[in-house]
């Protein structure tokens, strides 16, 4: 439901191109647009660019975010419908096309550490929208959809439209607006008993000017938000009708696959194409700068042919690099004096000198692949001075710009039809649209025939944009009572400063960074720097508790007296997990806490370590304070999924580099947690009333340190490097 086809995009092109540009600016920037609608659309009234109401009283919400399993199409629609006071049974959803009018600039607000004052909001949003148009921002990532677009875009648009409909009804009935109310897609006038549907009023309402700052409902008045309404995307996924990027089929379409330079930065030197060209079904062999592609009448034929090739690549001077050398370079950099400053409170070094005890630790995390279920795929057709692309991306506008550059065209000559994503996790964000670029270049070479590019799983694993490998070094000081009084951390990478800050009251904090760059491609990975930093912080906090000879949970709670929300979440997690109760001798519990993307998550893991040193995670309790909830069922699913995603990385995830290239190639050497070994997960929400936080990523970071801390509780062995299973086996074998 709600995907754009080529015909649909063309039919509303006049709407988008003709000035229906409210986007994520304040609704007050929207002029009367009814007159500029193409004839095919004039039976519909657009109150804002996000809301369209037809005479049959159907409300369509335009959602400028992609669907990749997180339920955002439903959640954002709920937020608009709530403020509109719509009848949910009459509400529909349409994913916004890759057009500048639908740039989603309000995601910028979600990353600001402060609120924009109302008096400045209009100007800020206008400037942000212009920037979003210029850079091509239509992004889904950073857990920003609900807390950015939803809070500042959808709710405001719904409230403004509701006020416009009430004003239109009051004018029609010649009564004060204060005497009118909206409910279930109708405007009611109680004194006279009159009523009119939104559909009957929409054309008049569309002529009115929206309010700049329409009042939003109090939480107590919600009837849609806060309920677990069924998601729009589920039925088509159950019956097989959902179309992902890899599912696209066009008349006369050919198939392509690639072999890229195995060493990042390498280039194609030469390739003898004769062998592949002679194979059944092969139509063309296309040389790219750093890869070779085979085009055939079927994917399997293309794959067999590309595997028959023997391309020669240079290694860009990186053929001697391996993982150990990368880590060694980071360690050397951290030993230097010229380190960047990422944060300072008090006097860390001086406090260490005065501490009763100083604890040192070094942690390491490896590169991680995204390993999404749907490999990289894109379909392209270049003909008659235009280019069309069908792909699943996390930023259609940015992907359109990449496609335009590859096609040698202006963005206006490119149409990108975004599809559902079989996973994203940051792999399909700007900066990683290599698969789109390749598809367009191949399509240009065989124009005007359309071609679908599909990467093999091996290409997908070995040519990812990986989560960065980090080394972090910590020094912590505790006083005579065991309280933490100093925290000094050094780590590599351009990490987010907020991710590196512990949530605990320390008093003296110092954060320093190095910036050693390897040739390995790096990119966003679900929860970004929080995934590394939470492992470091929560592992080290556990070490401080152990040095202080105090219970790890109680130790943390004592350091959270300044933060009632964090304290409440952690205390609740302890209660629900029966922290401190008896366990079998081979079982242990570990705890971890994070605040990420405006959401606080506390997790307790119950772990078994078998006689064979195999880690089994039996249960995870997660307590989440995201302020409030839009769709509780979807929110719980995101936390549960984040825990399983993070657990795969914590136990098994590791990309290693040898001779400049990635060693792992498929799920046999890059394994995942399966249904059989997934833990039982309990999720409890705290509705604190704080501003809405994100949900897609905050469940990921705490699971690795929670499991590592549980392993220590069982074995007494502190694992300071991921993945945990390989590290535990190595540690135990060295002790044998």
Regions found by a protein language model. Name each.
Residues 1-624, 712-721, 728-736:
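Structural alpha/beta core scaffold segments of enzyme domains
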Residues 627-631:
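Cytochrome P450 core scaffold surrounding the K-helix E-X-X-R motif
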Residues 528, 541, 686-699:
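Amphipathic, heptad-repeat alpha-helical segments used for oligomerization and assembly
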Residues 635, 657-673, 693-696:
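Hydrophobic alpha-helical bundle architecture
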Residues 674-692:
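Generic long, charged, amphipathic alpha-helical segments
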């Amino acid at each position: 439901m709600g995907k754009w086809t080529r015909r649909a995009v063309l039919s509303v092109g006049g709407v988008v191109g003709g000035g229906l540009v409210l986007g994520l600016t304040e609704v007050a920037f929207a002029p009367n647009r009814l007159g500029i609608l193409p004839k095919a659309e004039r039976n519909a009234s657009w109150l804002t660019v996000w809301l369209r109401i037809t005479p049959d009283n159907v409300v369509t919400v335009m959602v400028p975010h992609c669907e990749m399993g997180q339920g955002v199409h439903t959640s954002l629609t709920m937020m608009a419908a709530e403020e509109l006071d719509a009848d949910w049974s009459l509400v529909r959803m349409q994913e916004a096309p890759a057009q500048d009018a639908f740039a989603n600039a309000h995601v910028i607000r979600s990353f600001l550490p402060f609120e924009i004052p109302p008096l400045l909001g209009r100007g800020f949003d206008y400037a942000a929208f212009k920037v979003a148009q210029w850079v091509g921002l239509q992004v889904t990532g950073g857990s920003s959809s609900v807390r950015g677009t939803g809070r500042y875009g959808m709710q405001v648009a719904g409230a403004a439209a509701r006020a416009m409909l009430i004003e239109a009804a009051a004018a029609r009935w010649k009564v004060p607006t204060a005497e009118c109310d909206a409910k279930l897609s109708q405007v009611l006038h109680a004194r006279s008993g009159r009523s009119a549907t939104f559909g009957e009023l929409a054309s008049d309402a569309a002529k009115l000017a929206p309010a700049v700052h329409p009042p939003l409902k109090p939480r107590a008045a919600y009837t849609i938000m806060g309920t677990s309404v069924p998601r729009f995307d589920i039925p088509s996924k159950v019956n097989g009708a959902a179309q992902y990027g890899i599912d696209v089929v066009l008349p006369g379409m050919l198939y392509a696959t690639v072999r890229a330079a195995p060493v990042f930065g390498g280039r194609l030197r030469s390739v003898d194409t004769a062998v592949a060209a002679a194979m059944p079904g092969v139509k063309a062999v296309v040389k790219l700068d750093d890869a070779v592609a085979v085009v055939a009448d079927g994917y399997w034929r293309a794959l067999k042919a590309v595997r028959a090739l023997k391309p020669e690549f240079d290694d860009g001077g990186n053929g001697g690099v391996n993982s150990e050398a990368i880590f060694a370079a980071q360690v050397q950099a951290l030993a230097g004096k010229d380190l960047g400053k990422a944060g300072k409170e008090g006097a860390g070094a001086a406090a260490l000198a005065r501490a009763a005890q100083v604890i040192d630790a070094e942690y390491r995390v490896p590169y991680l692949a995204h390993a999404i279920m749907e490999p990289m795929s894109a379909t392209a057709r270049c003909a008659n001075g235009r280019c069309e692309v069908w792909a699943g991306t996390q930023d259609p506008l940015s992907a359109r710009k990449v496609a335009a550059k590859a096609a040698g065209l202006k963005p206006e000559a490119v149409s990108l039809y975004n599809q559902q994503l079989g996973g994203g996790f940051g792999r399909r964000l700007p900066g990683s649209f290599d698969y789109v670029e390749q598809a367009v270049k191949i399509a240009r070479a065989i124009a005007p025939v359309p071609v679908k590019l599909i990467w093999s799983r091996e290409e997908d694993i070995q040519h990812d944009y990986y989560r960065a490998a980090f080394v972090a070094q910590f020094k912590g000081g505790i006083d005579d009572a065991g309280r933490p009084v100093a925290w000094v951390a050094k780590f590599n990478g351009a990490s987010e400063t907020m991710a590196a800050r512990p949530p605990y009251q320390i008093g003296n904090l110092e954060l320093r960074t190095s910036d050693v760059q390897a040739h390995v491609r790096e990119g966003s990975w679900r929860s970004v720097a929080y995934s590394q930093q939470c492992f470091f912080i929560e592992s080290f906090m556990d070490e401080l508790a152990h040095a202080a000879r105090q219970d790890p949970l109680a130790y943390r709670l004592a350091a959270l007296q300044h933060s009632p929300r964090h304290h409440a979440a952690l205390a609740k997690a302890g209660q629900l997990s029966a922290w401190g109760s008896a366990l079998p001798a081979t079982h242990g519990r570990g705890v971890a806490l994070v605040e990420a993307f405006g959401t606080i998550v506390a997790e307790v893991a119950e772990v078994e370590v078998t006689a064979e040193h195999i880690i089994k995670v039996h249960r995870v309790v997660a307590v989440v304070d995201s302020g409030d909830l839009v769709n509780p069922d979807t929110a719980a699913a995101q936390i549960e999924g984040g825990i399983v995603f993070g657990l795969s990385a914590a136990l098994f995830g590791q990309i290693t580099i040898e001779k400049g290239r990635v060693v792992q190639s498929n799920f046999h050497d890059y394994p995942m947690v399966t249904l059989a070994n997934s833990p039982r997960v309990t999720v409890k929400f705290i509705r604190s009333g704080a501003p809405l936080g994100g949900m897609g990523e905050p469940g990921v970071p705490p699971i690795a340190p929670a499991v590592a801390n549980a392993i220590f509780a069982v074995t007494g062995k502190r694992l300071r490097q991921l993945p945990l299973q390989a590290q535990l086996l190595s540690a135990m074998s060295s002790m044998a």
